[in-house]
Amino acid sequence: MNRVEPPYDVKEALVFTQKMAQLSKALWKSIEKDWQQWLKPYDLNINEHHILWIAYQLNGASISEIAKFGVMHVSTAFNFSKKLEERGYLRFSKRLNDKRNTYVQLTEEGTEVFWSLLEEFDPTRNAVFKGSQPLYHLFGKFPEVAEMMCMIRHIYGDDFMEIFETSLTNIDNDFESVNGKLKKKAKDSAADEPAEELEPVNS
């Protein structure tokens, strides 16, 4: 935890933290609703989709990495990963140079589901997207949210933000906009590259 150095005004601190708390809660309620609707045709929940997302971006991730970057408890990461394994979307494995940690990778079916979800994304059904439109039309771009990213970096650390930024770069590299829809690029992506040598884990 970063040390807070005085002087600071306690009233200002209260107003700021409550402003962030209440705005974040309101924003999350809208995000959660739209996220759930996006996933509904695939019978996935938000944690499951987040796990697929992280496994794709890291080309295989440990349960502890999923918990860290997915902002969830280790047991939550493991239990939902097992459910995804049962559906054929993930496979569990051990790295030959790291027998302690359990890793998950997307299966071919899991990768197809992940790609399909992105291709089905419709921004017109997203309240955050629609709420940003006045700013987009005024400045010609979406809000950068640099201040929020700075705060998240100081709360969760550089590793968290590096994965976050990498995930956005990967989407930019792996997909293109075609007639208002995302389409997978024909070229090989990072997810197609061979991962470290793994051995399967018996369920």
Curated annotation (Swiss-Prot):
The entry's keywords: DNA-binding, Repressor, Sporulation, Transcription, Transcription regulation
UniProt superkingdom: Bacteria
PROSITE patterns linked to this entry: HTH_MARR_1, HTH_MARR_2
InterPro entries documented for this protein: HTH_MarR-typ (IPR000835), HTH_tscrpt_reg_Hpr (IPR023488), MarR/SlyA-like (IPR039422), Tscrpt_reg_MarR-type_CS (IPR023187), WH-like_DNA-bd_sf (IPR036388), WH_DNA-bd_sf (IPR036390)
Segments for region (Disordered): 183-203
GO biological process: negative regulation of DNA-templated transcription; regulation of DNA-templated transcription; response to stress; sporulation resulting in formation of a cellular spore
Compositionally biased spans, kind Acidic residues: 191-203
Cited NCBIfam families: PRK13777.1 (NF010349)
Protein name: DNA-binding transcriptional repressor ScoC
Species in which this protein is naturally found: Bacillus subtilis (strain 168)
